Curated annotation (Swiss-Prot):
Its EC number is 7.1.1.-. Gene3D superfamilies: NADH:ubiquinone/plastoquinone oxidoreductase, chain 3. The keyword RNA-binding does not apply. NDH-1 shuttles electrons from NADH, via FMN and iron-sulfur (Fe-S) centers, to quinones in the respiratory chain. The immediate electron acceptor for the enzyme in this species is believed to be ubiquinone. Couples the redox reaction to proton translocation (for every two electrons transferred, four hydrogen ions are translocated across the cytoplasmic membrane), and thus conserves the redox energy in a proton gradient. GO terms for molecular function: NADH dehydrogenase (ubiquinone) activity; NADH:ubiquinone reductase (non-electrogenic) activity; quinone binding. It holds the Pfam family Oxidored_q4. Keywords: Cell inner membrane, Cell membrane, Membrane, NAD, Quinone, Translocase, Transmembrane, Transmembrane helix, Transport, Ubiquinone. One of its GO terms (cellular component) is NADH dehydrogenase complex. It catalyses: a quinone + NADH + 5 H(+)(in) = a quinol + NAD(+) + 4 H(+)(out). This is NADH-quinone oxidoreductase subunit A. It is found in: Cell inner membrane. The chain crosses the membrane at residues 6-26, 64-84, 87-107. It is a multi-pass membrane protein.
Amino acid sequence: MLNHYLPVLIFLLVALVVGVAPLLMGSSLGPHRPDSEKLSPYECGFEAFEDARMKFDVRYYLVAILFILFDLEIAFLFPWAVVFDQIGMTGFLAMMLFLAILVVGFIYEWKKGALEWE
């Protein structure tokens, strides 16, 4: 049983070493000379005009969530399209139900004005 998972374990260990080793080497071998210029916030070569922690409009997050939702829909459609001829009418109806639920949700978001930018 362990023989089946040994390549995966080796892959994870190599990935961990490749990811962590440069970080450790940079922090241990790199110069440590902090000064006020290096510790100040950087904004295109100029002094910061205002607080760097500006509040974002909630609509950005809403659009991002909607994008992820419909991107995930496409991720479900690809495997379905590959096995479409093997799953028959039951698979077709299940996917149509899934798409109908997403369309109803999209229409709801549209009617509520979540996609408007004014």
